[in-house]
Amino acid sequence: MKFVLLFGVLLVTLFSYSSAEMLDDFDQADEDELLSLIEKEEARAKECTPRFYDCSHDRHSCCRSELFKDVCTCFYPEGGDNEVCTCQQPKHLKYMEKAAGKIKNLFG
């Protein structure tokens, strides 16, 4: 009986050790793959369009403000037939950023 118990403990120990090593190998492979993906993403990233600049060429290229990404807003100027698109911050997000800044200054 002692032999079976000793053999069982040894088997469980070896199994847990081998599974831990396999998990470490998988984690290392995942980390390497993630780093290579991040490097590729940074290399492919392009310049963002600053606030109040024309974004009609790429409507998803607006820069981020402190908390939120600016939105490409298109409109027709008064008396004009051409559509104009610029990166702007919606007013409700502007107010939220101001409130967050005040709270940060109050508690930070």
From Swiss-Prot:
Family annotation (InterPro entries): Spider_toxin_CSTX_knottin, Spider_toxin_CSTX_Knottin_CS
Written domain comment of the UniProt record: The presence of a 'disulfide through disulfide knot' structurally defines this protein as a knottin.
GO cellular component: extracellular region
Species of the source: Lycosa singoriensis (Wolf spider)
SS bond partners: C48-C63, C55-C72, C62-C87, C74-C85
Descriptive protein name: U3-lycotoxin-Ls1w
Keyword Secreted included in the entry's annotation: yes
Location of this chain's protein in the cell: Secreted
Single GO MF descriptor: toxin activity
Chief site of localization: secreted
Propeptide stretch(es), residue numbers: 21-44
